[in-house]
Amino acid sequence: FPLVALGGITPSNAPSFLRLGFRRVASLGYLQGLQLSELAEAVRTFCQPRLLLCGGIDPTSEAGITADARHAERLGVRCYTILTAITRQDSEAFHGLMPLPDAEIVGQLEALRRQDPPAAAKIGLVSSLHQVGLIASCIRRLFPLCQILWDPILRTSSGYQVLEEGDRAEIDRAISAVDLL
């Protein structure tokens, strides 16, 4: 539904309208009551895009969700991060990874339910095709308007296989769970 309000919608209650399924909210009355010095920050808060990043953490911060979040925030995007795995690597070699259990990943996503909803989500490093579907279904349940991108990481540049090979049906299920590959 489109929702336009001339009063009553503030930065603190706008997310609740978005969680109810409204595509947009407007708050002219709130902005009108601000001092000129407060206006720029208020507009930025209302208009700042939100991105959900799901992936592994790289100790060097050269890859993974740390690098993704750093780049997105430089562009003015507010990021939420969901950890899927802890990697052991340096700038020269990949030494392994420890995937987080499904329940931990879902728990992290559930903890974000009261945040402003993300417009888009990026799924990066996962340890299984099953995790792609699990993460996507949880995102769709919590944030139904969120567009989901899967950027599959099959193996590292040094040849370490990150994502197990699946059969055709598993691959099709994972791909159909997301909006963009």
Task: Please describe what each predicted stretch is.
Residues 14-46, 80-88:
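Glycine-rich phosphate-binding active-site loops on the catalytic face of alpha/beta enzymes
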Residues 1-12:
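Glycine-rich beta-to-alpha transition loops that act as phosphate-gripper elements at the mouths
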Residues 46-120:
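Small-residue (G/A/S/T)-rich helix-start motifs and N-terminal tracts that mark the onset
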Residues 4-5, 120-124:
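Short catalytic-loop micro-motif centered on adjacent basic/acidic residues
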Residues 123, 128-181:
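Conserved beta-alpha-beta core of the PfkB/ribokinase-like small-molecule kinase fold
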Residues 7-9, 29-30, 83-84, 125, ...:
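Short secondary-structure boundary segments
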